[in-house]
Amino acid sequence: MLFLSFHAGSWESWCCCCLIPADRPWDRGQHWQLEMADTRSVHETRFEAAVKVIQSLPKNGSFQPTNEMMLKFYSFYKQATEGPCKLSRPGFWDPIGRYKWDAWSSLGDMTKEEAMSAYVEEMKKIIETMPMTEKVEELLRVIGPFYEIVEDKKSGRSSDITSDLDNVLTSTPNAKTVNGKAESSDSGAESEEEEAQEEVKGAEQSDNDKKMMKKSADHKNLEVIVTNGYDKDGFVQDIQNDIHASSSLNGRSTEEVKPIEENLGQTGKSAVCIHQDINDDHVEDVAGIQHLTSDSDSEVYCDSMEQFGQEESLDSFTSNNGPFQYYLGGHSSQPVENSGFCEDVQVPPGNGNIGNMQVVAVEGKGEVKHGGEDGRNNSGAPHREKRGGESDEFSNVRRGRGHRMQYLSEGTKGRQVGSGGDGERWGSDRGSRGSLNEQIALVLMRLQEDMQNVLQRLQKLETLTALQAKSSTTTLQTTPQPTSQRPSWWPFEMSPGVLTFAIIWPFIARWLVYLYYQRRRRKLN
């Protein structure tokens, strides 16, 4: 005798009580039947819970299943409760019944257990979108956890990543900042897979960087030595004004500008030295190879894409290598000798005959500063001057605008104005304001010309479209309209002749057939 009692619940909650008489041994067939009963009870329990959830859905609730979804549930429900479809298909007057019959009959000979499990599987797909109710909670409790746990098989890969991160953290990165942007170069951390030549190059580069840093620590003053009889006080005041103006444009702060020397005895000429300490926010690359520019640093409207690559004029005064000196001497035969300087540039005298100008820059690769510029041309590359008496022209015309170094005479009190384009001038206030106004005027003129060109093109397009419209209308009017064969009072769409032919042709065909048979009879007679 076998007695089974089941309770609805999850896989762990149902219990089975077996009462087996002592005189009967345990049969394998009974054991298989018990297992089938257990599995069937689980499918039935889950199916009943899912059906209760579907039946408890409100008509105007937040979750509204689609028609296709309801057809699936209907077909699985009918297959699980009644088996395969054996009914005839409804008539054309019942389209909903026909759809239901098609969905049910498409399951074929699916067993009830398979239909129940399919019903539950479809319910699992949408159970997360349903509102949490008592029926849904019961279904979740019956189903149990149905999420799959995916094992992480990328442990080796993650260990490689962590080792790479450890190598990066333990290395000594050499950060270089140019124009307020950070540029990191990890010269101390080479991987094991790199070649020996790259390691040697990295070691040599680090040694060169250390040497240059030592040199930069020695040079902390910015000396601008001006000779050839310029007014000392006026020059100092102008330079201070220019430094404050340029630093305010760039958003940088100048901590102090003070004279550190007032007398340099050389051939009875006066000299002025300016000491300037700039914050560490602006540090140039020691090697002078890589230069980063910032489009937001420009305060002047750039008319062309050529001006976007220009550097700022104040960069030349705040290089990482330390100070630079620029001399205005009266004799070209007096060279400037200094081991820290890289190149000398001799500029031929202009109309003012101020003599030779020697510009010397302390830059990693020997960059030359012209009139307060930072040694870069229009495209951002550094100027390279030749020693063999050759010198690059200081005039570079960009789309009709002057871009040149001006040679000023001793009578005038102005100084050289650096190359424009980035909105900063190392020169007098009047010169910078004048050049800025000229650039604004040129930009406005170009804008007006462009607007006029656009307006002219629009007018041409409007006239062309108007002419095309007129020509199309005239061609339509000149083309002869097909005369309608039907009168205005005719109610039918077809013409009267067509209608008459449609009515008469059967009689004509009948008459022709009659004539044929009549002739045939005459021949027979």
Swiss-Prot record:
Chain positions recorded as an acyl-CoA binding sites: 54-63, 74-78, 100, 119
Residues passing through the membrane, by range: 489-509
Annotated segments matching region Disordered: 157-216, 367-433
Keyword Ion transport: no
Location in the cell: Peroxisome membrane
Main location: membrane
Alphabetical keyword list: Acetylation, Autophagy, Coiled coil, Lipid-binding, Membrane, Peroxisome, Phosphoprotein, Transmembrane, Transmembrane helix, Transport
GO-annotated molecular function: fatty-acyl-CoA binding
Listed Basic and acidic residues bias regions: 198-216, 367-376, 422-432
CDD domains, per the entry: ACBP
Membrane topology of the entry: Single-pass membrane protein
This protein's record includes keyword Acetylation: yes
PTM annotation (Phosphoserine): residues: 184-185, 187, 191, 206, 270, 304, 419
PROSITE patterns, per the entry: ACB_1 (PS00880), ACB_2 (PS51228)
Similarity section: Belongs to the ATG37 family.
PANTHER family linked: ACYL-COA-BINDING DOMAIN-CONTAINING PROTEIN 5, ACYL-COA-BINDING PROTEIN, ACBP
Protein name according to UniProt: Acyl-CoA-binding domain-containing protein 5
Gene: ACBD5
